[in-house]
Amino acid sequence: MDYDLFQSDDEEILATFIQATQKQETLSAQIDVDDSEEDLVDGLHLPEFNCSGRDTLKSQLCEGGFLGNGYAQLDPPRSRLDYLCFDFAPAQLAVGAVRNYLYGEACKNVQKLLTVVMGQQHLQATAASMNSGWYRVRQQVTHFYHLMLLLRGNELLPSHFLDGFRQLLNDQLDADTWKVLYFAEHNKGNDCQAPAYHLYHGVLEWRFLDLHILYASGNDQAFLGQLERTLDDLIVCAGHHYRSKHRSELIHSSPFMCRCNKELWLLLKRLIPKWLGERELDFWTLFHKAMQRHKSLHFQGESNAISLAYHELYSWLRLGLARLDEYNSEGWYQPDHSPLTAAPESFQTASLLKQFLASQPDEQQRRVYLIQLSPLQLQLGKPDTDVLCQLWEYFHRSLNCNFSVGTELDQLPLTCSNGSAYVDRYNKLLSKSHIEDLNLSSFTMYAWMLGKTLKLLPSQGRSNQRQKLLGRIFSKFSAAKLLALNEPGIHHVIELFLCLLLCHEDLSELAPKLREMLLCLALEKLPPVRRILVAKGHMALLLLHAQHRLSMDDYVSKLLNQLATIRNDAEVGAIYVGSLQAIFNLADDFNRGEQQLLGPWLAHYVEKCGQASQDRVWQTLHNLILRLSERRAVAGNASGIKEALQQHIMPLVRTQYVSSHSSWLPKLAANFIALENNGDKLLLGFLQGPEPINMAASAQLLLQVLEDGGRPASSTILQVWVKSLVLLNAQHESVLALMPHVTQLEEFRLLAIDPTSLEGGREPLCAFFGALGRRAQQEEAAAHVRMQLSHKLHAYVNHFELWLPPDRSRSELGSRFYSFLAIVIYNCSTLAYVRSKPSCFFHLAMVRFLLTTQLQAGVPPEGRLPQVVHKIFPVLLQGIGRLPYRTDAYVAKTLEQLVQHWTPHFSFSSNAKLVARPYATLLQADVDGELAQFVLQLLVTQFLVVQRRRAGQHAGLVITIMQQLIESTGKEQEEQLLTVLRGVHIPLLEHVMFVDEVDLSRNQVFGLYKVLISHDAYKRSQAVRDMCSNHLRSLAEKHLAHCTYFYFQMLINLAELAPDLVAPILSFIREQAEQVELKRGAGEDVGIRKCLQRLQKVLSRV
């Protein structure tokens, strides 16, 4: 609205009147003024309202206002006449005509402001030129009131002046006018040029000054009527202000449009008790009557919506007025320095609450109302227990409701995650002196208000009212009602109980009663979701028992009995577990029944829950055991806790140590070892039992024991180190952490291991067992020394057969483990093998891993095991080669079985060179060739035997291996070729002799011969050729008499391939043939002669 519509044009009238009055003689016109000079305050500026914009809850009042200038007194200060803004001398103001003129001007100025504000357009032309003059117009009226206040004791002051003026304002300021005026605030203050601003603030000033003048007149009836009219107008302004707000804004907004409006309310609140004196009326009584009049005029109707709107305005304005007491006499906001002792009846909280609740408010309306009610109960006045009783009567019928307003805010979790969270939440809530959070449900606000009130009542000497209030609450909780609660209802009961307990210093009386009420919610009678909620409530109460050092024996026993009735339900158990850490942390001497929490239910829960939940249990138990060494615990019931741990938790830890991946279990096992008198025995029990699925468990356990100050045996440390190197690797953090402890051992230092061999990515196992083996092979090492070293080796690898889990044998871990077997056998075979001792490393390695019953029965090995054994095979053979394999029947048999059962499985690749690699590596590594020859003899003996002229299943594989051995031999490696031939040449020729002519292996052997005779070493070495010839001679001597045809067939085929090999022995063959004929005694044998002729014919062709 454009307020600049009017400008006064009375200058000529004013000038004329001044001239007329100046011509009068001063002495004849003067009126004797009753006020004496000494009653006037020199230098006092006339107060006025100077706006600073919208009011806030804690805004300071204007220093130059009425309150700061002493106008809250019955007899306000008086100023000199020359401070008034009129164009008259002070003496002229005493002239009756002047006062008549000023009265007329005041009436006219008010009409100007009213007219322009209400928008009469015909005044627009004159208003445009007065933009800067509305403040002057308002000020002249205000100063007229100051003049009247100054002359209020003068008997000649016409009473009709103010009566008419008052009537003018009362007639013009109706509801429509206030609807335009109520928001006419501005942060520029009196520099604002809007006429509505000056009319609004002028009316506030005029009404206030008029009340002062009217009170001084002694007309009580008129004064009380005008006071009521002023309150009515102020409430109308507040009503318009209320309608401009959303409901949620009310809790953070001031009910006063600006601080000028607030200051007028505050002035009236301070003056009314002085004005009314001994009368039965006071400010709050007048206010409540004014609100009733406001309701009849502006909230007409019987609907709940109208009633609720009225009560919202009522509670908002009532709170704002109550907070005015937080301002001091100078207008400064000082809530901490203002004594607030208003009686409950002043606010009429109980009666108004009853009307509000009867109007069926929704949840948001309840929340806003309770936020505005709580300061009246707790900060601004004494608590009214009737209010809490009314609210309980209202809420207890709705416990099963969600108290939701249906907005996104209410999608936040209703319940807490566990008992600790419940206690923390309501501790934090009750620590607040006031609440303004609309996310809290109305029931939560009630519980908070109830708790705060119960805490406040004893300090006011009203303990009996607290007991009555508690009795009123408890009377509503029967067992049947508790069992009828749904999930929200149980949550509400929990938060109610917690608010009651948290506000009591001594829980010894209240806690047992509440826990028994909660125990009425028997778990077996509830569905799963409600069980969980009840369990959270129990844990919250149990925590409070622990905090206040109350006995928990009976309570815990009943809780665990209820848990047992539902078969130790894991979800309920999880709630119990969630509070264990907090309960144990609060225990100092463990004398209040904490040991009962370490029962079978906990083991049942751990077996059912997931890894993360288990870890929380382990961490809790770890922290608990650490606390048992504290002085107060030792003096208390630490022994009872230890007994419970040993009885119920130790068996659980043993099984979980093996079956769980948790890194907490090694720490917990170390804790139990520290508790034991014979800790070393328990340590060995963990280390030598079934291997944990957590491969680092042994190292982690040992490290924890060492960190705890334990001193395990050197062999134990080395065993764990070796096992960790096998199951993990040298770069694993646990192995690296263990290494400093290992290198400090005397046993380790005696091996004189080069430290660099343990670094740089090398395999420490090779260095360690290599050094151990070299120590045993030293010439000066006596038999008993070697025996001691053997014992140490077996201690280092104790129970190694348990290290590799069956399900991991085909993984990378399996490869590392089989490599470990090969490393030990290669480096320490003489220590690993003990004759006639089935438990020695060598025997166990064979029967459990390398020569298993399944393998010997013909069951193919699974997965990548053939590749793994293929890789370590030459190392194994070399290690066995250091044993007396020719004289020790067991070793010889083992070697034979390794060749027999594993060679067929080396055909996993079509790459012949790869397949033959184990034997090729052995051939190259065996310097004297003795072992290689022995192994090759075993190989051909096993697989080249011919039965019924048919080759064995794996003959082709072995022939291929032999051919690869020949091909891989360098031209300078005559000895290697001789080794091969010594081992396989004769069996190969015999295979050709006796196998069927159509068998593939026969052609394979001839193909091998082609490779042999084309080999550079064969061509260059006479010894190789001589050996081949000698083998042919030996075969002639052996087979010519009985297998004449087979021998000559083989020889003829060789002659076709290598005539140079056969030709030199032709004469020997002839002589052997003649010898056979002589032995037979039948003369020349036609068959032999024909074979000789064919052989000669073949040689002659070549």
Curated annotation (Swiss-Prot):
It holds the Pfam family MMS22L_N. Keywords: Chromatin regulator, Chromosome, DNA damage, DNA repair, Nucleus. Signal peptide: none annotated. It is found in: Nucleus; Chromosome. One of its GO terms (biological process) is chromatin organization. InterPro entries: ARM-type_fold, MMS22-like, MMS22L_C, MMS22L_N. It comes from the Eukaryota. Disulfide bonds: none annotated. The keyword Nucleus applies. One of its GO terms (cellular component) is nuclear replication fork. SUPFAM superfamilies: ARM repeat. Belongs to the MMS22 family. MMS22L subfamily. Involved in recombination-dependent repair of stalled or collapsed replication forks. This is Protein MMS22-like. It comes from Drosophila melanogaster (Fruit fly).
